[in-house]
Swiss-Prot record:
PROSITE patterns: ATP_GRASP, SUCCINYL_COA_LIG_3
Protein name as annotated: Succinate--CoA ligase [ADP-forming] subunit beta
Gene that produces this protein: sucC
Keywords: ATP-binding, Ligase, Magnesium, Metal-binding, Nucleotide-binding, Tricarboxylic acid cycle
Domain ATP-grasp: 9-248
Annotated binding of Mg(2+), by residue: N203, D217
């Protein structure tokens, strides 16, 4: 689960992570009032107006502006709220700006990168620091890897003092800045583990000319599998930032990711789902989604899956590819037939079922009298997808 920058900073602040003073605003008038308050409390001649969307690259897209007065903040907020911000992470459709973060201005001396995430290869957390603050860390790792330090942290023992100091040394911090940097890194790691985050990213981490170490931007992602331990975090979810179909799928516990293709797919198992997407591509189509219904696919699960797939108007055909190991193919076939009757399928559905009771399942589909096309293997399924698209 993703959250907004201001929400992430609010959580980090509770763990002693230093963040700038900031106030969230949902209207231009609220933004002006927030600016008035900040100008009274700060010595900086400017405040920062930051669009709050679930995407990076806001600065380059015009989503971060400096203002020298509350009146200027009001004007910026009027233009920014309700506007669509297009960044390299939003796609061409962009995201609508519905809230702003008004933040105190900083007298910045240096900018760095600091991030913590899970490294599945080593089964450990990895602390990453770079002298290239404000840059995309993937680009830094590819083009200037010598400017990036990775420190693997054993999740059992946690972050050790020498590791935090090593990271601060790498950034070239000295004296009071060094001590503040170590304290910041330790506080961030504590927050990351306590809240069960999958990512805690500070980009940039800034050193002010007064020696303060602050998170100028913060990105926090939660591990969805651990959200049951943090019931208070559910209120932080902003469904307006999510794809409507992906949100509906999450309510039915379906693993669904929307893509930009024309062939919907319903599969049990992530590996088979990825293979099916390749099959669709090789057949001349483009996958419209990733949908894993899991090992215990039921009639209700299948019906919900069809509803979500058909919610995408670009879908011209559907490929159902099920391997019946735990789940029985005849049960899945029954679910497909029932769903087809209830929903009223108007696009061709190609169904490939292999495994337990596959023969019975094929017979059920053939005798259903519905627009269900059974396939007897991957090659046959590919050919029938191709044919369905040609007549769509």
């Amino acid at each position: 689960m993703n959250i907004h920058e201001y929400q992430g900073k609010g959580i980090l602040k509770q763990f002693g992570v230093a963040v700038p003073k900031g106030i969230v605003a949902f209207s231009a008038e609220e933004a002006k009032q927030a600016a008035e308050q900040l100008f009274e409390e700060q010595s900086s001649p400017v405040v920062v107006v930051k669009a709050q969307i679930h995407a990076g690259g806001r600065g380059k897209a015009g989503g971060v502006k400096l203002a020298k007065s509350p009146e200027e903040v009001f004007e910026i907020a009027q233009k920014m709220l309700g506007a669509t911000l297009v960044t390299h992470q939003t796609g061409p459709e962009g995201k609508e700006v519905r809230r702003l973060l008004i933040e105190e201005g900083m007298n910045i001396d240096k900018e760095f990168y600091l991030g913590i995430t899970l490294d599945r290869t080593t089964s450990s957390n990895v602390l990453m620091v770079s002298t290239e603050g404000g840059m995309e860390i993937e680009k830094v790792a590819e083009e200037t890897p010598e400017k990036l330090l990775k420190i693997h942290v054993d999740p059992v023992y946690g972050l050790q003092g020498f590791q935090a100091r090593k990271a601060a040394f790498f950034l070239g911090l000295q004296g009071e800045q060094f001590r503040n940097g170590v304290k910041f890194i330790e506080a961030l790691y504590n927050a990351y583990t306590t809240i069960d985050a999958s990512l805690a990213e500070i980009n940039p981490l800034v050193i002010t000319k007064e020696g303060r170490v602050l998170a100028l931007d913060a990105k926090i992602n939660f591990d969805d599998n651990a959200l049951y331990r943090h019931s208070d975090f559910h209120d932080l979810r902003d469904i307006t930032e999510e794809d409507p179909l992906e949100y509906e799928a999450s309510k039915s516990n379906l693993n669904y990711v929307r893509l930009d293709g024309n062939v919907g797919c319903m599969v049990n198992g992530a590996g088979l789902a990825m293979g099916t997407m390749d099959l669709i591509q090789l057949s001349g189509g483009r996958p419209a989604n990733f949908l894993d219904v899991g090992g215990g696919a039921s009639s209700k699960t299948v019906e919900e899956g069809f509803k979500i797939i058909l919610g995408d108007k670009n879908v011209k055909a559907i490929l159902v590819n099920i391997f019946g190991g735990i789940v029985r193919c005849d049960r899945v076939a029954g679910g497909i037939i029932e769903a087809a009757k209830n929903i009223g399928l108007k696009v061709p559905v190609i169904v490939r079922l292999e495994g337990t009771n596959a023969t019975e399942a094929q017979k059920m589909l053939d005798e259903s009298g519905l627009n269900l096309i059974s396939a007897k293997g991957l090659r046959d399924a590919a050919e029938k997808v191709q044919k369905a698209l040609a007549t769509a």
